[in-house]
Every structure is written in C-alpha cells, then in structure tokens.
Amino acid sequence: IAVSFAESREQILNIKEKSQNCKIISKIESVKGVENYNEIIEVSDGVMIARGDLSRAVTIEKVPVLQKKFTKIALLKKKFVIAATEMLLSMTENPYPTNAEASDVANAVFDKVDAVMLSEETAIGKYPVDSVIMMRKIIVESEKFLEEEKNLL
C-alpha cells in the first residue's frame, strides 16, 4: 500500500493495523512528512520520494538534498527506496530527455535507490514506450559504471 502524503508514525501504524500483512510504502511529499521522516521510515517498509508534490511543499533547491538524505537514511535502516515523479518529464512532449533528467536518473542509481518510477511520462505522455526504454538504458549504463568502478579500486 502506498500512503500518499505520509505525515506521521501514527498514521502509518493505523494503516498497518487495518491492512494486516501488507507492505507499506510511505510517500514523502509534504512539509510534515519531511519533518517526521525519521519516525515515518521506522514504521514503514519502504519510502517513495515523491519529488513532484515535494517540490511544491518545500523550495525546489531542497528537493535533491532531501532525496539524497532520505535515501541514505532508508538504506541504512534496510528499507527500500523509490525515487518518483518528473524523472524524465520532458518526454511527455519530446522523444528524448534533457541531459539533466538523464543525470537525475543516473544519480538515483548511484545513490542505490531500489527503483525509479515514471508517472506522467507513461500515463499521459506522447512517448510512453520510449520513456520506459530510455529509463532502462540510463539505468543499465549507470549500473555498468558502478560495476566498473568496483574494479577500478
């Protein structure tokens, strides 16, 4: 179960109690979710960093920092992490992503997120299949680099 606008430990525990044996993914996309992240991640099975809504809740320059911080904390606590929203947003209208978007996806891979997620790109975009193919290509190249990097050291 993905809990939109997860904002407190109590909210997540209440949902867990009512949905026995379901995994809970807490979507961090509000100021309260940011403020209570540590307590939310403790009782969640994983976290989705929902960058679109998050960028409307906090100033845009904080989103990349929060993504890195939340990813690191979740992985240290052995929780899974999904980076979501606006990963390849320009592909809703264009057949190719921007360089910044490609770097954004690669950096999520380098940070060891468990998944990256497309939204508008595949839901309402003009190039849904191309978006998936491009996302996969970026992930494959990024993972290759991580393997090569191990051999360099």
Regions found by a protein language model. Give the residues of each.
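Non-catalytic helical/linker scaffolds that mediate oligomerization, partner binding
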Residues: I1-L153
